[in-house]
Amino acid sequence: MAREXSKENTR
């Protein structure tokens, strides 16, 4: 799982 997408999800 990429952390970049995770960051956008927890914006």
UniProtKB/Swiss-Prot annotation:
Family: Belongs to the GTP-binding elongation factor family. EF-G/EF-2 subfamily.
Domain of life the protein comes from: Bacteria
Transmembrane parts of this sequence: none
Underlying gene: fusA
Name of protein: Elongation factor G
Keyword Oxidoreductase appears in the UniProt entry: no
Stated induction or repression of this protein's expression: By salt stress.
Function, as annotated: Catalyzes the GTP-dependent ribosomal translocation step during translation elongation. During this step, the ribosome changes from the pre-translocational (PRE) to the post-translocational (POST) state as the newly formed A-site-bound peptidyl-tRNA and P-site-bound deacylated tRNA move to the P and E sites, respectively. Catalyzes the coordinated movement of the two tRNA molecules, the mRNA and conformational changes in the ribosome.
Keywords linked to the UniProt accession: Cytoplasm, Elongation factor, GTP-binding, Nucleotide-binding, Protein biosynthesis, Stress response
